[in-house]
Amino acid sequence: MKREFSAGGVLVHVLDGRPVMAAIRPGGKPEGLWALPKGRIGEGEKPEVTAVREVEEETGARGTLVRKLGDIRYVYTWQGERIFKVVSFYLLRYEAGELGKLSAEYAHEVADVQWLPLDEAPRLLAYGGERDMARHAIAALDGEPI
């Protein structure tokens, strides 16, 4: 079985005194479908570097690595081939940039970018494994300043 490895991030920030996290609506997906930014690990690239890069490419905001949150593992079928995929997620603190201001190179991949209230993110994200990563981020930040 073919294997694929990706990495993504839970980018957290405080906006108007409220903790928030960045979420994307991937291109071609319906309104209201929120996901975490992520992408394939480049050849020779470390997963945590991929996570920081993908978050910036897909949200327009740059984050600082805090820690690994965990992995999501699943099998899917593409063009008749079963693929085992591992996606590693990392907690990132907002550093700079404007959410939603994407370069033309990546704008086609992302239909929308929003800050979601951190405490509501586990309910608002579309995919179960990503909801778990949002919960892990909340637990990791418990009592820690964002």
Language-model segments: which ranges?
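Unchanged
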Residues: 41-132
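Short, charged, intrinsically disordered terminal tails
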Residues: 142-146
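Residue-level marker of positions within ordered structural domains that often coincide
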Residues: 14, 95, 139
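A small-molecule sensor/coupling module
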Residues: 133-137
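N-terminal strand-loop-strand
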Residues: 1-36
